Amino acid sequence: MKYRRLGKTGLHVSSVGIGTWQLGNHWGKQFEQDEVNNIFARASELGINLVDTAECYGHHVSENFIGQALASSRDRWIIATKFGHNRRSELPGEAHWQADQVRLQLEASLHALKTDYIDIYQFHSGTREQLDNDDLWTMLNKQVQAGKVRYLGISIGQPSQLYQVDRATALGVSVIQTIYNAINNKAAETVLPSCQRQDLGVLARVPLASGFLSGKYQPDAQFPVNDVRAERKPEVNQQQITQALAVLENVPANVEPASWACAWCLQHPAISSVIPGIKTIEQLQINAAGADL
């Protein structure tokens, strides 16, 4: 495994981390704790030290799995989680973006993750209006001062949300998470240069384009109802799979497509780490191999 500096945080993260939306049981698979424990044990053996999650991945389900799995090895892991999409009944409408409600989400995430601090706490795919909330960022920076959060981040919904990236330094944000992969590299045009100017760490999410760059899918692929990809229009999936298959024609015969896709992202000097999702140890190992290509 290779390691990269996470911007101005000074942290050194594995160039391949772990994304954990799948652990929220939203991607066609139900996980058990023993299975998750084995995945993280193998990840440690491979030198991976970064995991990204969110409170909305199964309403803390993913965080709970991670908290159990890392209970005895917390200090060697850099844990990133997110806020803003809490769907509990006591947080109706847009209230989950307000400072007092985000504070509740933070406490719930700390409890689920079984830790007294979160390394990177990220604003999760909100709007410009939701970002421009002085009370929210004042509260979050107080959590940094209190030691409950080490660094703040913004996970932008789309690369077009450059305003949020450009505001990072003023808000006390050190890390940006963005979509970046071989079929959607729009972030390279504006987002990544802004991150470089501000010395922000960058986490590249969906580096496998929702799994389509793994080479496992054909344009007529169907997904089970408990898989988020089933919620998309079939023609959208079909188009993305077709694009992915065209890109994968560039992959050498002796290289796994997913390894290549991770390595493709890591070619850009602004990228600190890629955070592909996984369902199995085999997928974990294939992704990790991308660090050495």
Task: Enumerate the language-model features and the residues they cover.
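Active-site mouth loops of central-metabolism enzymes
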Residues: 22-34, 88-103, 125-130
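Short, acidic/polar
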Residues: 30-43, 97-114, 159-167, 261
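Conserved, mostly hydrophobic/aromatic
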Residues: 6, 18, 36, 43, ...
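Beta/alpha (TIM)-barrel catalytic core signal, keyed to glycine-rich beta->alpha loops juxtaposed to Asp/Glu
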Residues: 126-293
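Active-site groove signature of glycoside hydrolases
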Residues: 110-129
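A short, structured active-site edge motif that brings together acidic residues
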Residues: 76-88
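Alpha-helical scaffolding within the catalytic cores
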Residues: 1-4, 105-107, 163, 187
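N-terminal binding-site loop/beta-alpha segment at the start of enzyme catalytic domains
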Residues: 1-77
